[in-house]
Amino acid sequence: MTRHNLRLFISAIFLSSLLSVTASADQLLQSIQADYKQRLGDLFIDFHRNPELSTAEVRTAKKLTAELRSNGFEVSEGIGGTGIVALMENGPGPLVMLRADMDGLPLKEKSGLPYASTATQLDPITGKVFPVMHACGHDVHITSLAGTAKQMAERRDKWSGTLMLIGQPAEERIMGARAMMRDNLWQRFGTPDYALAFHVSAGLRAGLINVQEG
């Protein structure tokens, strides 16, 4: 499985647990592939080329916010710093949360990719300037969240409940989730009945999904 197809497949993971069993997996995959060619591929490249350090994900949050709003989500910004919370209410049912982390790492990219990051940024935590890259796959995560938003919005007849999409800051520093909780995340937006997160992994064979409860 190529990296391109792996990203598409991972995007489908978010959807598979929420869509009705009547939805065709083949149709869903075709829809995701079409969206990747038309929009998500360029969005991924943009996120990869423009990474931001923990607590400084300003541009990333703005771009993800615009994507989610364009698909009909009500988005609140500045939650726990640069965090965002997007809600779509769709009748009675559970509140389901999907989370994607947004921050890059203070590393210089040497991939040789035509869209490799050349970014540098002042780290608000240390006060030092670092090269920045998406070395942990968060560019894949937020692109997949944007793709999930579109697929779920277009399939509202296939599910019922409330969908909460979260763009989490500062995951790499183990700070962002706590910051959002201190900002009264559950009290303001509701406590999820189910919460889902995913992460790409270089330690797993391509095409393999490892599911853990926690």
Provide a role label for each language-model segment:
Residues L122-M133, D139-V140, D157-G214:
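Histidine/acidic-residue-rich, glycine-tolerant segments that coordinate divalent metal ions
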Residues M1-I10:
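Bacterial N-terminal signal peptides that target proteins for export
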